[in-house]
Structure formats: C-alpha cells, structure tokens
C-alpha cells in the first residue's frame, strides 16, 4: 500500500472532458437531485459503523474509527454525493479520479469497505439492486466480435507504460513468494524470483518437460512461454493484444527461443491441434461468465490423452459472484471491459457439466496477490512523472492507483482470492 500526501487532489477544471467525460462533468438533473441526499445519508450511516474516519471540508469528522483508523478526506462533498447518487460504486471511483476525496492510505480505506461490502447497503435496497445498478453493455460481452477490442482497451495501453511498474520478467499476475509468514513484507528484490516460482509451479502442475507440446492461452509478455521452452517444450501461445504479441516475440527472440515458441494473434476459441499441456494465467477473468463453458470446452478439446491443464484464476465467493454477475462496475468501465471473476464452485460446476475435465489440485494464494499489488502500486506511484511523459495524465495516475489499491484491498479483506488449479480428465489416473 502507498501512503499519499493529503491536499494534492486535481481540480475539476484541469480534467480533459473529451478524455474523461465521466470524471470531468459532475452529474446533474432530476435523478441526481433525488439520489444525492439519499447517497449522502446512506454513506454517513454506513461509515458510522466502520473502523474509519471521514473528514469533511469544515474539519468535522464522522465514522466509527479511532484517531489511528484509516482516514478518508472528502474535499467536495456535494460532488461526491452527486456522483455516488448517480452511479453508485462507479461514481465512488470516479469521485476519487476527480479528486473529490482522497486517503492517507487508500488501500486501508478501501479494505474497510471491502471487508463489509455485503452489509453496507440496507437489505431493502439490496433487494432492489436490479432496478438501479447499471447492467453490462452488450457491446462489452466477450463474443468473438467484441473480445479483441475489450482486451485491447487494457493491454494495448502501451508496453512502455506497463514497463514502468512491472519487473524485468514483465509478468502481470500474482507472484508466489517464498515466505509470507505473519508480518512478512516481501521486497522488490524478491519479485522476479517470486514470479518465476509461480510460473514454474504451474508448469510442473501441467507436466511440462522436454518434448511437451504446450498451448498457452493468454501470452502476457512471454515469460511463461520462455520458461516452458527452456524446459525443452515446444510452445504455441495465443493473445488478442497486438502490443503484447509484438513485445513477447522480441523477448522470446532475445532469449534465443524463437524456434521453440510461436506467438499468434488469435482467439483461443479458434485454436486447433492437440497439446500435452494447456496453461493459462489469469485469463478466465477476461472471458465473461457467458463464455466460461466455451473456455473450458476449448481446453478439453485441445488436450491430448493423458494431458493436463494448469490455470491461475482470480476468484470471489460464490454468493457474491451470483449477486454481481450482471452488474456493470467501475472496473468494467475503466480497467477490464467485459471481465468477470468466477468462484471456485463455478469453475468446478462448469467443468463437471460441460467437459470431461476435473479439478485435480487447487492451491489458494490470495495473500501473495495482496503483496504483489502492494509492490506494483509502490513502483507505479514512484514513477508517475514518467507515466506523464508517456502521455498518461494525472487522472490516469489516480485511476491506476485506485485500481491497484482497490484490488489489493479485495485480497487483503478476503473478498478476492487467487487459485492455481490443475485439471485432467475424469477417467485419467
């Protein structure tokens, strides 16, 4: 988690309206006039029960926390209430991007909310959520027509931007640290080794060795393909990101492995052939719940007899997954269009009903993801000037900081988890 010097929020007039239409303009109109006071009242009622302090512009404090509790400072309470009243949690995130509020420790503030997310809204409003919570646009569902643009909106931002905060392995997923005993805080020096440990465990789970024919669904920037090829495997990796394909190919060539690794710009549903191992790291989150069946059916169809698949998947509790599967969120709007997190139960149910695959082994490592995100946020926050030089403005920097802290808070609170899952066929010994 990264601490912030308070009092440095961007003013609304500095926000480019064409680039950030949902942030530059404060919502108005009849709906907002009705919803804003309701949002204000619900917010203050909720924080009164939370171990949190909220400071208003007049210096008054609310919240149920002590002086040592996480501090949320609201600079523009009317704008904050208007945004939250207009679009709920999307408005909550946009109000941070606009500078309506800030926190001395953003992760800590968001963790307080995340750990109590199911009880923040009164029961009667929870039952009515279908009437006021935005729905995912059909244009963002991950059909074969939409998936490439959804992936591009995140991963094609700029290789140079991702290089600012990723390590030399260019691995953008949870690491697996050697020691996460109570109170341990891994340093950046341990990061690359932790990423390799994660990759190697997946490759071991999939049985990748000399001569293995490996399919990777979701290339990233090529590190897993490189590690597999170094074991003597032949790798085909597919991605829908032009930027990732380009840099991954360069990194693979620089490693002297271009004869062993092929990176194709291709939807995984269009892959043909037979593979001894299928590996996929944090790809299922981008598929969307409507297409989980086809994702696992593709793996099932491509896996050779006796083969195994190993995936890494961010998960959420099953009840929360069911409650939010049709909800359009801040993360959808600004970070991952079309994405949705499965539960472990959903993965088991889909593979049982729609494939011949079974979950053979599973390991939970959510605490490792919290530490991964902490390190990535610290690195990004230290290099925002360089991001600005690449054309990513202060609103983007606040958005990215919010995204990393929001995600870290989810793992710290237990609202999110991440699993390494090994699958094989049910009749396989």
Pin down the residues of each PLM region:
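A short glycine-rich, Lys/Arg-flanked "PGG" loop and its adjoining helix->strand segment in the class I
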Residues: 293-305
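Conserved class I S-adenosyl-L-methionine
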Residues: 210-218
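Class I SAM-dependent methyltransferase SAM/SAH-binding core
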Residues: 230-269
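Conserved beta-strand signature within the Rossmann-like core of class I S-adenosyl-L-methionine
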Residues: 306-314
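Feature captures hydrophobic
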Residues: 1-195, 201-204
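Substrate-binding/catalytic lobe of Class I Rossmann-like enzymes that use SAM or dcSAM, i.e.
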Residues: 315-429
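Conserved SAM-binding loop of SAM-dependent methyltransferases across substrates and taxa
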Residues: 221-232
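A short acidic, Gly/Pro-enriched loop at the edge of an enzyme's catalytic core
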Residues: 269-279
């Amino acid at each position: 988690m990264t601490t912030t010097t308070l009092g440095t929020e961007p003013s609304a007039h500095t926000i480019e309206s064409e680039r950030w239409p949902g942030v530059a303009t404060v919502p108005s109109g009849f709906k907002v006039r009705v919803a804003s006071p309701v949002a204000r009242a619900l917010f203050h009622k909720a924080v009164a029960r939370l171990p949190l302090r909220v400071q208003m512009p007049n210096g008054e404090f609310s919240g149920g926390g002590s002086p040592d509790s996480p501090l949320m400072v609201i600079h523009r309470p009317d704008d904050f209430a208007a945004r939250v009243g207009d679009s709920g949690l999307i408005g909550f995130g946009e109000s941070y991007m606009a500078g309506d509020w800030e926190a001395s420790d953003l992760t800590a503030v968001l963790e307080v909310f995340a750990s109590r997310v199911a009880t923040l809204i009164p029961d009667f409003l929870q039952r009515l959520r279908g009437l006021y919570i935005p729905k995912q646009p059909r244009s963002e569902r991950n059909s074969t027509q939409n998936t490439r643009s959804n992936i591009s909106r995140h991963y094609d931002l700029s290789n140079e931007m991702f290089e600012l905060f990723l390590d030399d392995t260019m691995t953008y997923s949870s690491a697996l640290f050697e020691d996460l005993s109570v109170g341990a805080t891994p340093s950046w020096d341990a990061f690359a080794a932790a990423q390799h440990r994660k990759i190697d465990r997946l490759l071991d789970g999939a049985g990748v060795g000399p001569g293995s024919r490996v399919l990777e669904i979701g290339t990233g920037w090529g590190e897993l393909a490189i590690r597999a090829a170094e074991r003597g495997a032949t790798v085909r990796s597919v991605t829908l990101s032009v930027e990732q394909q380009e840099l991954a190919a360069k990194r693979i060539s620089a490693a002297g492995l271009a004869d062993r690794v092929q990176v194709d710009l291709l939807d995984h549903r269009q892959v043909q052939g037979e593979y001894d191992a299928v590996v996929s790291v944090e790809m299922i989150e981008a598929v969307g719940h409507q297409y989980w069946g086809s994702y696992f059916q593709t793996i099932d169809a491509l896996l050779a007899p006796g083969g195994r698949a190993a995936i890494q998947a961010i998960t959420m509790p099953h009840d929360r997954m069911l409650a939010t599967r049709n909800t359009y969120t801040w993360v959808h709007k600004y970070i991952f269009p079309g994405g949705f997190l499965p539960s472990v139960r959903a993965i088991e149910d889909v593979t049982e009903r729609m494939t011949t695959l079974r979950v053979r082994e599973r390991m939970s490592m959510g605490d490792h993801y919290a530490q991964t995100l902490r390190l990535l946020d610290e690195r990004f926050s230290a290099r925002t000037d360089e991001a600005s030089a690449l054309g990513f403005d202060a609103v983007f920097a606040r958005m990215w900081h919010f995204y990393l802290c929001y995600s870290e808070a989810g793992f710290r609170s237990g609202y999110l988890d991440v699993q390494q899952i090994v699958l094989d066929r049910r009749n396989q010994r």
